[in-house]
Amino acid sequence: MTINEILQAARKRAEQMNLPYGGALTPQEAAEVWRNAPGAKLVDVRTRAEWDYVGHIPGAVEIELLTYPGNRPNSAFVSELERQVDKQAPVMFICRSGARSHNAALLALQAGYATSYNVLEGFEGDRDASGHRNTVGGWRAAGLPWTQG
């Protein structure tokens, strides 16, 4: 698929899911857009503890949406985003499973990022039948680049 076809599919998903922002991407689609769309950024909105103990995506912009400990909203989220990401470029948000990144995409839209996207499944994906993550969906299970520690 071309970048335009991927973004059209993401927009169609957003319409089906009644999402107000640019679209919803699978991890594989997000990686393709990030690699090939001029200026595209992947923003990881997990906590510092998650980056440190679960893993990083090399080259991703890291801005906590909620701070750890306590899961309090990061009052500087939008200003940090504006400092690091061009409002005209595609910006994709990823978290553990897709919930916080949805909220980040909403905040970005409100801040003037018209092409903001949520990465479905997130970094770790959903839990499997045994209650474990990283086996069903997600960035890691898709075999996309990440490092630990």
Show where each model-derived region lies.
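Rhodanese-like catalytic fold shared by cysteine-dependent sulfurtransferases
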Residues: 1-40, 48-90, 101-149
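Short, surface-exposed ligand- or partner-binding patches at beta-edge/loop junctions that are enriched
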Residues: 93-94
